[in-house]
Amino acid sequence: MKKKLALLLACTMALGLTACGGSKPAAAPETTAAATEAAAESSEESKADEKTEAAGGDMDALIEAAKAEGELTVYGSCEEEYLSAACQNFEKLYGIKTKYQRLSTSEVYTKVSEEAGKPSADVWFGGTMDPYNEAVAAGLLEPYDAINAVNLIGDEYKDPTNCWYGIYKGILGFMVNTEELERLGLEAPKTWDDLTKEEYKGLIMMSNPNTAGTAKLIINTMIQMKGHDEAMEYFKALDKNIAQYTKSGSGPSKMVGPGECVIAIGFLHDGIYQILQGYDNIQLIVPEDGTSFEVGATAILKGASHPN
């Protein structure tokens, strides 16, 4: 597979799940006429790679090829602070102009689908893997080999067809405003079923499944825990307590500290970020009856204008 310098973006901010760039050796082909020809071609490619490395390194060649293309454009579905830092760091490291547009995972999927093989961006960076899997099924992502994929914790942190690789992991749970709960004389919810109690009516926020991959994961989690029919009944009951469905998955977490939201459902790392911003009135809760986690991914969009 062709090596892609665009993947270096993931390298700059990978959190131990994977890094990117490079390719793995292919398995030995069977001895047929076609296989012999393929082996010869592979040998020639290997020689070309060796020449490149001898001339200053394979990565150096990729960097120069990418610089010649002028810029890198990113659709980002992680938090904007993280996305901005990744792009700035990439630009600083490699001297390649990098620009981004922050969109939810569902928005990126819709946009790339509409662009039909001629995407406005080159890389999709961050956001839960479910929409990435949909994009794989629709043929919207470019397969690539990541040389550092051998460092993955497990195979569940990458696409089986190598169309995306994980760059972080997030645990699903609740974030509550302890001051507001105390003012209302309420205990914090401990389980998913607790969220349907009448005492929490109008106090809960979660993201919209039409726009946020986070909400889709919440739905999938309940289906796995309860079965489809019981899960649908659960969401009917939960809906009675929902004050607002936000556009983005991190939206509810941002409203907990200021008191606009008493109980938020989402990824706990979003709550940690708010605590680091000074909101020490936020408590993080891992549901006692079980939960799930996301794998935040990165991928190259098929038909990217800057493939190197």
Regions found by a protein language model. Name each.
Residues D130-E134, V262-N281:
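A ligand-binding cleft/hinge motif common to bilobed small-molecule-binding domains
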Residues T73-C87, K99-E115, P119-E260:
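Extracytoplasmic ligand-binding site segments that recognize negatively charged/polar headgroups
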Residues M1-E69:
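Short, low-complexity disordered leader/linker segments with a strong preference
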Residues E37, G56-K67, E71-K97, F174, ...:
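Short, polar/charged alpha-helical segment
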Residues A65-K67, G166, T214, G290-F293:
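Short, flexible turn/loop "capping" segments at secondary-structure junctions
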Residues K190-E199, G296-N308:
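Bilobed periplasmic-binding protein/Venus flytrap-like ligand-binding cleft at the lobe interface
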Residues G170, Y234-D239, Y245-T246, G278-A304:
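Periplasmic-binding protein-like
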